[in-house]
């Protein structure tokens, strides 16, 4: 079971698992467009923000970042009781699992690809609005990821085919122009030869 929430202005979707075991599937089948959020040094929900195509985690609007942090803090048993917490976030692709790690536990491939939001305090107004958008879904995470990858491969093939057609057209246009230049050059050469060996006799016109 996955919980989905709608963030606004601009609109984004974020989601989280209901327990640490489901978090394992979220880690396994996350998307390259996803950004992972967690309360630093405390147990909490794993919240994922899904970016739009072409965006990077550096493009997250400040208000959307705040809403993600509020959602993470609210869904931490200990964190929600603290006056303030630090939130850690990183691209999904930077999450690392190793043998023997507990369910829901993660490391990072690159510590430099990790950011923090310090001293996050509860904002009840934001929490109340987000909670109203809560939607619980039964999701086949593996199927969704496979569909996403299939669509991406289709788009890449389409782009490559369009590129090949454009390159072919450009090549044909270039060849056409070169053929025209060659033809023009040949005609000029032939005219020069004709004029050289066939001089006009003015008496012919008298």
Swiss-Prot record:
Stretches in topological domain Extracellular: 1-34
Location of this chain's protein in the cell: Membrane
Principal location class: membrane
Topological domains, Cytoplasmic: 52-206
Transmembrane segments: 35-51
Coiled coil: 144-182
Key word Cytoplasm present: no
Pfam families, sorted: NFACT-R_1 (PF05670)
Intrachain S-S bonds: none
Entry protein name: Coiled-coil domain-containing protein 25 homolog
Species annotation: Dictyostelium discoideum
Top-level taxonomy: Eukaryota, Amoebozoa, Evosea, Eumycetozoa, Dictyostelia
